[in-house]
């Protein structure tokens, strides 16, 4: 039996490998480079540039560690940062290509559209061909949302991909949208010397996350020189004058900038698939699926950004594997109750489960445990003692229902929180944990103990 997969991003290639491992004949169709947006235009290249900015931060504070540098010794070579970024991306793309070869997955470069429930029209480098498949998995990914009055032009009005490959570091940048993508780019370019302005419609940055965490992050971002305007909206742009015109309340403001980066979210990429030819239900929000990742047509599956919902690469990996396993005859269902959410800013932010507001709306008087990085030995050693770990536990049994962190390397700590929550552990079980010392993970341990009033160093 043949499984055809449309899209070679995290959901698509993970599904391809998983299905092949389970003995399936797999055909993968993708028009671009394997790895999708995440590997080529998103997660990996942005984090590569952000890591360069992190190194710059450390060098700037070298004197506080007893290391003195000659005056004027620090400089930023944007082209070398770009080269390093591309080296990382290329190595990982080659890794995905190796996985395809190792697992004997047929990869066709091109686009695919449905002719019927099982027939696909593939248009690629070798022209057009029609292929039949017993099952089809749609993993077509997503694309940036445009503002109707300010469409992307790749020259002044940028999407996130455009911002990755600028020829030089901008002296000024307006970012429309204070979510994950907007805040990561704001932190990157501000630390590289750009004057950055964020315009966000909500009353705070990263509005989907815990209010305490968002407040601490905004304070740090403003300390780094970023101009933040919440409860504000971009109204129009003057491309000739390179000016963004925006409103806050009834007042109108103008901000001149080298570029405008629009980061107001992403939408499922479904155009051109001809889903109606296969009878697959869909909407602008994505393709509805059940717990097995099946669409309304049982032998057609969908996962990743194409279904809307959680637009995260690690969720897409998981969804792809579940879809492949179910298509291969295993009775498996998705569980996305505890998906980590990471923001690679400075300091980093990592969350899982509910925010405090969400927890209180369900459980009422929840137990809150907190521990500050300023009381953690490893954080002080690293001279990165800003931030805290915050834990929400439901009141009856003490089960952990949410964890929010802001601080050094918290994206590496959130996996421990995920294990705790997936194991349905309660806060009092923390008494039996032993966290290595000195490590940042002690903050999570102490925050757990704090929910039952037993934190030692608080």
Swiss-Prot record:
One GO molecular-function entry: dihydrolipoyl dehydrogenase (NADH) activity
A Pfam family assignment: Pyr_redox_dim
EC primary class: oxidoreductase
EC number: 1.8.1.4
Amino acids binding NAD(+): 177-181, 200, 263-266
Cofactor(s) the protein needs: FAD
More info: The active site is a redox-active disulfide bond.
Family: Belongs to the class-I pyridine nucleotide-disulfide oxidoreductase family.
Name of the protein this chain belongs to: Dihydrolipoyl dehydrogenase
Provenance organism: Bacillus subtilis (strain 168)
Lineage summary: Bacteria, Bacillati, Bacillota, Bacilli, Bacillales
């Amino acid at each position: 039996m043949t499984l055809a997969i449309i899209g070679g991003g995290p959901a698509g290639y993970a599904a391809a490998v998983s299905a092949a491992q389970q003995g399936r004949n797999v055909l993968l169709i993708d028009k671009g480079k394997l790895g999708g947006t995440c590997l080529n235009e998103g997660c990996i290249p942005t984090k590569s540039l952000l890591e360069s900015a992190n190194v710059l931060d450390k060098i700037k504070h070298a004197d506080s560690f007893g290391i003195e540098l000659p005056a004027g010794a620090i400089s930023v070579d944007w082209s070398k940062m770009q080269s390093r970024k591309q080296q990382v991306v290329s190595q990982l793309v080659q890794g995905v290509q190796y996985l395809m070869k190792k697992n004997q997955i047929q990869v066709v470069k091109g686009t695919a559209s449905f002719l019927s429930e099982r027939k696909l029209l593939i248009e690629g480098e070798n022209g057009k061909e029609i292929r039949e498949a017993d099952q089809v998995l749609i993993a077509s990914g997503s694309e940036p949302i445009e503002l109707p009055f300010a469409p992307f032009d790749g020259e002044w009005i940028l999407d996130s991909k455009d911002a990755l490959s600028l020829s030089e570091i901008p002296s000024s940048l307006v970012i429309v949208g204070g979510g994950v993508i907007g805040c990561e780019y704001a932190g990157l370019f501000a630390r590289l010397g750009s004057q950055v302005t964020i315009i966000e419609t909500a009353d705070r940055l990263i509005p989907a996350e815990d209010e305490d965490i968002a407040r601490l992050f905004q304070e740090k971002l403003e300390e780094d020189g970023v101009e933040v305007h919440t409860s504000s909206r971009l109204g129009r742009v003057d491309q000739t004058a390179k000016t963004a015109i925006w409103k806050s309340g009834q007042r109108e403001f103008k901000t001149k900038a080298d570029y405008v980066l629009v980061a107001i979210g992403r939408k499922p990429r479904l155009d051109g698939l001809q889903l109606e030819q296969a009878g697959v239900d869909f909407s602008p929000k994505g393709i509805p699926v059940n717990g097995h990742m099946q669409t309304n047509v049982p032998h057609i599956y969908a996962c990743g950004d194409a279904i809307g919902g959680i637009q995260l690469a690690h969720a897409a990996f998981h969804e792809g594997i579940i879809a492949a396993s179910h298509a291969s005859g295993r009775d498996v269902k998705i569980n996305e109750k505890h998906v980590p959410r990471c923001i690679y800013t400075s300091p980093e932010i990592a969350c899982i489960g509910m925010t405090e507001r969400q927890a209180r709306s369900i459980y009422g008087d929840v137990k809150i445990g907190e521990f500050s990085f300023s009381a953690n030995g490893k954080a002080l050693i690293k001279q990165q003692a800003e931030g805290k770990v915050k834990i929400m536990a439901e009141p009856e049994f003490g089960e952990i229902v949410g964890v929010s962190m802001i601080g050094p390397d918290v994206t590496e700590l959130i996996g421990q929180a995920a294990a705790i929550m997936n194991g349905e552990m309660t806060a009092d079980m923390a008494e039996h944990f032993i966290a290595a010392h000195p490590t940042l993970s002690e903050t999570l341990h102490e925050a757990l103990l704090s929910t039952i009033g037993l934190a030692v160093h608080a």
